[in-house]
Amino acid sequence: MPTIRQLIEHLDVTGEYCQFALDAEQFGDDLVQAWTGIENGAHLLWLAAAVGVEPKKIIATACDLLGEVFEQIETAGQETAQVLEAVHAWQRGERSADEVDRSGWDAYGLIARMGDRSPLAPDAEEVADAAVWLTSLVRDLPPSLSPDLAEHDQVLWCGSAWMMVDCLAQALASHQSPDDPPPGERQHAFEKAMCRFAILIREHIVGTEVQTAAQQRGAWPLC
């Protein structure tokens, strides 16, 4: 029976998630247990996307993560609120993916124009970055993560899911740590945020769902 480490290495065509594969080795060949035990939210959402969990469910989960962090960071700007509004409208069928994409470009353009002169606090800027990654998930939404989907497109889409969660964890770490924190304090806050996100993701997507998606895609068990 293949192991979870082998599954992640198989899905990780770019070699960017080697540490994740090593960390997952402790779970042996139990995918459901791995889903329950992994404490890094970015890795969880990437794995769910990579094995083929329903793409719109990935987006809904990501949107809820962004919404929760947005409510915690009082300096988060209007550009993030507009992205959330656009994605929620898209989920209701009231906006097109192109309109969501434009809201992301608007947010990105605002950040880029301000550059180093940005009045946004670091945590608010990281939330805005996460919002841009969320719009890319909508823009590049695949009909399904089937074996026929171009590998390049699949890598980008799953990577966007990982990046969005990573930006949110960076935002919370910045928000909860002073400008010049003691050694290790910001990293601790980052890891704590990732653990929190892992819990929230598991509230949306359960381990058996991930296992079934992987089996249907032919990614698990590996031949």
Language-model segment annotations:
Residues 1-223:
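Short, glycine-biased loop/turn motifs at secondary-structure junctions and
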